[in-house]
Amino acid sequence: MKLLLFTALVLVVISLIEVEAENERACIPLEKECTKTPGNCCSGLKCDCYRRFEQGVAKGIQCWCIEKDVTYKGI
């Protein structure tokens, strides 16, 4: 019985530590790059990705944290 209670207590402590670590993770602010961590933009922002071309040749993808529900158009 003691072993069961001890095991339950250890599991509760471990889960609390994991939740606290996730809450401390810093978010990415507006207009900062989020290519490597797309799900880490601050609240109210989304990670929007674009394929970059140089002289018609694809040079990779870059992602930025932008405001939700905002659309950007080329000029």
Curated annotation (Swiss-Prot):
Localisation per UniProt entry: Secreted
Propeptide: 22-25
Post-translational modifications: Contains 4 disulfide bonds.
Keyword NADP: no
Pfam families: Toxin_35
Signal sequence coordinates: 1-21
Gene Ontology cellular-component annotations: extracellular region
Family affiliation: Belongs to the neurotoxin 19 (CSTX) family. 06 (U6-Lctx) subfamily.
UniProt-recorded name of the protein: U6-lycotoxin-Ls1b
Organism from which the protein derives: Lycosa singoriensis
